[in-house]
């Protein structure tokens, strides 16, 4: 495989009650995905608190964007007790869809 990983982004509008909304009008979730497997290698998110960023990373890193999507979404709902939970899931949904579309279009070219 010529390229082993790619960076995918998902976006969601943030509630105005969040301090992050002052600097960012929306949430951006970025995931580094292993192309052949869909495994999430790393993550970035536009939240202000280092702890919130660390929590988001703990939800996703090492999991599969397709196979583990439901369990990741459930974990976010149960563990992320802030108003950013739904935007995180929306951004994750966008990334999952983008990854599936990308692989459908490009998997033939990625085989080497």
Region roles according to the model:
Residues 10-18:
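Short Pro/Gly-enriched beta-strand edge/turn motifs at strand-loop
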Residues 1-11:
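Short, compositionally biased leader-like segments
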Residues 18-30, 35-112:
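Active-site- and interface-proximal helix/loop "cap" or "latch" segments in soluble metabolic
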